[in-house]
UniProtKB/Swiss-Prot annotation:
This is Hydroxyacylglutathione hydrolase-like protein. Hydrolase acting on ester bonds. It holds the Pfam family Lactamase_B. Zn(2+) 1 binds at H54, H56, H110, D134. It comes from Gallus gallus (Chicken). Zn(2+) 2 binds at D58, H59, D134, H173. Keywords: Hydrolase, Metal-binding, Zinc. The gene is HAGHL. Its EC number is 3.1.2.-. The keyword Glycoprotein does not apply. Gene3D superfamilies: Ribonuclease Z/Hydroxyacylglutathione hydrolase-like. One of its GO terms (biological process) is methylglyoxal catabolic process to D-lactate via S-lactoyl-glutathione. Its cofactor is Zn(2+). PANTHER family: BETA LACTAMASE DOMAIN, HYDROXYACYLGLUTATHIONE HYDROLASE-LIKE PROTEIN.
Amino acid sequence: MKVKVISVLEDNYMYLVIEESTRDAVAVDAAVPKRLLEIVRKEDVVLRAVLITHHHWDHARGNEELVRLCPGLRVYGADERIGALTHRVAPDEELTFGAIRVRCLFTPCHTKGHMCYFMWEDGSLDAPALFSGDTLFVGGCGQFLEGTAEQMYTNLTQVLGDLPKETKVFCGHECTVRNLKFALKVEPENEAVKKKLAWARQRDDEDLPTVPSTLQEEFLYNPFLRVTEEAVQKFTGRKEPVEVLRALRTEKDNFKKPKERPHPQAMLAFDWGLFAPFLEKK
């Protein structure tokens, strides 16, 4: 199972998961169809389905166009607000695409219909992959836009946290540097945070992605997975894990975003007219 990381818009990621023996492929969060189909042609694969983590435009806006360009394409997701949806999936439902297996992990909070996708390939020794959308990021987690701290705690500690620690994490956005800057504020003595931040800055300087991480790594430097650690509790002034998580999210929401260089893929959004509706004169 090969995963192609595709940078689009300002800081989004799409993914193309390829079964190398058959050259069939499944995409995750196909927001920019033209870019996705460029990669499909370059890799010489057949796109069979699209898995959508949630309905937000920067993850799902390309569905209608993609279905038009690829007749018969299946679009999977859990939220009725997802455009061009052909298959509504249920929590813990398993899907099969050739040798690629998918378990649908329901993680409501960022949106009420958010679904993560846990993938592995039958007979392969490769580590499984988690496509976590806007629930779990490298060094962070998504905002609680339609849910609660209790829900996110369950998502992070049980639904995702119980997966094999070698699982590779492919998240929905490139926000690692700013996440780890916040993590360093929370745990200024955490050497794992310092090391990962230095690495992420180097990757950013080279316009390279910081995905995937692994679940095992995330438990070392991601404060939202470290709510039982003394240093994290001291930072928040809370002891109960859900309250620690709630306080962390509030602090992160108010954390000043560092000035980052514009991602080179951001300008492609203008080239493809993605912002045209917002720029038209009224």
